[in-house]
């Protein structure tokens, strides 16, 4: 876990969210997991569900696009099945990539980018 993930985890926990971090999802038959979701948090009071994927990498945008697409798709597929199965599957999931820079981009894998 990076220091960025730790700060995000602490922030959402402090705000009263139920937070899961570094959660492996999609157990594979031959062993291992399909993906790991970095931060998934739910606030009972306002019913806000958020999936955050922080990254401080220096990969190309095409590589990042591929990686974030896989993580966000896995989030939509598994959050209601494996992480918070007691939530209604029709609830909206806010998905955000947290990066150190974004250039002129506003989205990655169709989701919002926030820079630190």
Give the location of each predicted region:
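Intrinsically disordered, low-complexity Ser/Thr/Pro/Gly-rich regulatory segments
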Residues: 1-116
């Amino acid at each position: 876990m990076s220091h960025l993930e730790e700060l995000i985890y602490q922030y959402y926990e402090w705000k009263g969210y139920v937070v899961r971090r570094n959660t492996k999802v999609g157990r594979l038959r031959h062993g291992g997991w399909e993906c790991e979701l970095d931060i998934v948090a739910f606030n009972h009071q306002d019913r806000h569900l958020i999936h955050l994927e922080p990254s401080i990498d220096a990969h190309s945008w095409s590589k990042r696009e591929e990686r974030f697409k896989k993580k966000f798709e896995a989030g939509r597929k598994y959050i209601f099945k494996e992480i918070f199965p007691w939530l209604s599957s029709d609830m909206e999931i806010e998905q955000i990539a947290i990066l150190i820079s974004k250039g002129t981009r506003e989205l990655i894998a169709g989701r919002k980018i926030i820079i630190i």
